[in-house]
């Protein structure tokens, strides 16, 4: 079978014919094709179709990248269309599939790893195979075509620059770390001068602003803190400054502390501005993804994938575990369960779900996010399209997911994490309020008034035994005024007195028996209930220890086992006697 090789170059299409029909099956192909003479001995030029201009070259190569067969390439392949038993080697499998679908093209296509060595050799020694093509011209044409192709792929649009999102979310994370470090340093540094302030103020930004406003704690009388703190908290801070236990510092120390506090306040203001910028860019570039997972989670997903286009090409299963690569490969290596979620775990919809529904919600949310990403990356909108139209898919999907989550949980949704409304707009956070931290109430230790604490012992709760109520006589007839006769009341009093006497007598007997047994009344009652008290012939009680009880139980078990064995033996003997009697009867009958 004759072998042809299709080579795409920056100058045009080259169709080469192999001199050996079994060229691709040779083991020494790589060594022979290492030189220009070796390549010339292996293949020869069948035909070469040159590009007319740089624009034509760009169109042809762009079509090849997308896996399309251009008319120019189709006309070149018509030269080998009528030949029988022909195979064509192609470098790109996608292009090979497109060539195979051409009408009337009965050519066996080869686009696997066996063609790698021959294509590498052809690219290295292409000027020697094509006459009139200089190496300098070839490099110049390749460079110009690569630049044109890069500009064509980019399709520059200021609204679709996802690089800004990648840089913004990275800077936001770095700012959070630096801001936290600097704020902690300000607290530790200024805490030597005013240690009580850190317990009163939890907010780092308010702490830094107060350091800038008040300076030395001795300025608490003249400092106006109403712009930073509410009135109650301001009074608490001034009272603490008046009786502070901190050390004194110099003016130079204070200037350095205030310089660091200025950095904290500046970073906080810039962070707020950067967060607003990131929200605006996410709503412009990926409105559907923002509506589903929020701007922060969406920006981290885009940054992790590298670009919006790369993320849109990922399937839902990849988006679900994006950011948990270490856990995934560790689970695959150890053959354990793979993780259910990665960066998408921080989305508000997954945060609202309980533990049993988090994995299911992550899977559904990732599927909807993958659809929204493809719309964000590939959809082309008119100039009249509004932001609501662009985010319609994500808004509707979020609304359906919220309803599904409510059905799974069986309770109304509570806003958590990234708050996105059903219309796709982000809910503004609540106004920041500084709450006073709980302090120790020393007044609670003082006694009420000047009176000493009472030393009266509390009465213990007495146990009263339940007494049986006497049944009322049915024969008693009440009087007209609703009262009973005096005789009945006297009888009930006599009965109750008899019961009290009988109870006292029983208690006295129990005490006597307990004394004889050498036990207290409670222990005697307990042992009597458990069966650990025995009586001799005279009726004197004696306590049995637990060891003796265990021994007695073991002996009883042994005795019962011995009786069972004797019964079994006797039963076996009777069965044997009965069997012998039956045999004798049979013998007599036979005789």
UniProtKB/Swiss-Prot annotation:
Chief location: nucleus
Record's keyword terms, sorted: Nucleus, Ribonucleoprotein, Ribosome biogenesis, rRNA processing
GO biological process: box C/D sno(s)RNA 3'-end processing; endonucleolytic cleavage in 5'-ETS of tricistronic rRNA transcript (SSU-rRNA, 5.8S rRNA, LSU-rRNA); endonucleolytic cleavage in ITS1 to separate SSU-rRNA from 5.8S rRNA and LSU-rRNA from tricistronic rRNA transcript (SSU-rRNA, 5.8S rRNA, LSU-rRNA); endonucleolytic cleavage to generate mature 5'-end of SSU-rRNA from (SSU-rRNA, 5.8S rRNA, LSU-rRNA); protein localization to nucleolus; snoRNA guided rRNA 2'-O-methylation
Biased composition (Basic residues): 581-591
Alphabetized Pfam families for the sequence: Nop, NOP5NT
Ranges of compositional bias, category Basic and acidic residues: 453-462, 476-486, 505-515, 557-571
Protein name: Nucleolar protein 58
